[in-house]
Amino acid sequence: MLLASKEKPGLAPVFLCSLIQTMTESDHPTPELQAAKSWLDAAQRILVLTGAGLSTASGIPDFRGPQGVWTRDPDAEKLSDIRYYLSDPNIRKKAWLSRRDSPVWQAQPGLGHEVLARFEETGRLDTLVTQNIDGLHQLAGSSPDRVIEIHGTIREVACLACAYRVPMQTVLERLAAGEQDPECPDCGGILKSATISFGQSLVAHDLARAEAATRHCDLLLAVGSTLSVYPVAGLVPIAKETGARIVIVNGEPTAMDDTADAVLVGDLNKVLPSVLDEATR
């Protein structure tokens, strides 16, 4: 069974790269930035992996950063743990209020989303695997056929007992009408956002697609992810093992920096366009 996990599996391989490059925000191109650009320009089958850091500029806080949701309120992490969600009605009620008040509903795609959507037009972006549940890639113009929402989407609701699935707004209307822990109208089961919580199985088809694209890519570009949640983080060493270049762009160090060919650290809305500007022309 494939579970979302905060821990690294004991048998997961790690491949150390002999060259680890870092950069900070600068007005002048660095050798590391130039190298990343040249690799992207030469690559023909690029896998992009995005995380919460890409959406912070859109007003959606990340989880583990210095101002992350779970950093500021560790108890909030219980809302994303399937064990608590299934066993505690109060957790479910809090989770529904959190969904109702989510900044996702007012958020617009940021520059990073838009740059990646434009980059897709080059025909060299094979697959975009996102850990984000906000749907901003599609709103920015990324093709839904190329986007794998590996942790699901907050924009839909699914029953945990049957096949019932509807847009989130349908259930939020029931919340506005006074329901606190809405049940499935078809079977009476527990409803939940169509996202993957800790301890919950990933969609096997989505993970299989992501792994296949990883083995097929010649460059993996990771953007805005701490690369600490498995099995998604495990895509990086898989790509490395098959010979792909690894470029990481993030606002802080990640768990996979030692595996990368280049690690570019800085404001994503400045660094990412710098990396992709020539490649999108």
Which stretches of residues belong to each language-model region?
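Conserved catalytic core of sirtuin-type NAD+-dependent deacylases
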Residues: 2-281
